[in-house]
Amino acid sequence: MDFLLEALTNWLKEMLVGGIMSNLSGMFDSVNQQVADISVQVGQTPQGWNGSIFNMIENLSNSIMVPIAGVILAIVMTVDLIQMIADKNNLHDVDTWMIFKCVFKSAAAILIVTNTWNIVMGVFDMAQSVVAQAAGIINSDASIDISSVMTDLEPRLMEMDLGPLFGLWFQSLFIGITMWALYICIFIVIYGRMIEIYLVTSVAPVPMAAMMGKEWGGMGQNYLRSLLALGFQAFLIIVCVAIYAVLVQNIALEDDIIMAIWSCVGYTVLLCFTLFKTGSLAKSVFQAH
């Protein structure tokens, strides 16, 4: 009877240990790949990230938004002229400089609208240059490596009782599901930012048309601040990855495999949280809303 019980116990142990090793091996591969891809993704300009989407957005902006921006520009300049006349006692106190001012503002506004795409792309080119310089300075490996604490893991697991092994198996299963969820979160942040950039740039001529307006000028100024926030969000993301890289390098020093794995999960959750915060932080820095 004892022989059967011992055989059953060993069989359960082998099954649980095999399941634990299977859950742990390659658990962080997808997250490591996504984290390594962050620097590549955020360091690209809208044109370099996806040329097909870029060309489509450029065509939509030039063919649809620019004519609408022209109408808005005419309205804004007309309203400004009417206000200028009303402020000067219905032309009784008018000076010649008012005419030159109106002509200059109109010419500047037309120049801005016709070169909106170049201005917008210039903002992201500048941000890409900053990110490239930051990535060159940081140059840290952010991959999670727990192979050093898994070398003698299987013999240590076989020495454990069934109860702790069941608990460890459930933990490894839960951690595996958690890491996939974190992989999806990182994907959403990085790709969501690029989609937001394309959406914002597609309507660029409309807010830029109001840039020179007295009453409507705040629309264009806030739009420029939003562009700067989106561009420099990439720099904040690079800093987050650099901090994450420093933290995960200490994981290999852990002797306890469970502590090492939960540390990996904790650091990755922290990375996801900070990545989600980079957008609002960048907007608060540039006072964009």
Name each region found by the language model.
Residues 1-72, 88-97, 107-178, 217, ...:
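Gly/Ser-rich, low-complexity
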Residues 67-79, 197:
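Hydrophobic alpha-helical transmembrane segments
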Residues 74-78, 113-120, 188, 192, ...:
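Alpha-helical transmembrane segments of polytopic integral membrane proteins
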Residues 81-88, 211-216:
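Structural signal for the C-terminal ends of transmembrane alpha-helices
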Residues 98-100, 196:
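Cytoplasmic-side transmembrane-helix entry/capping segments in multi-pass membrane proteins
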Residues 166-217, 235, 239-245:
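Hydrophobic alpha-helical transmembrane segments of integral membrane proteins
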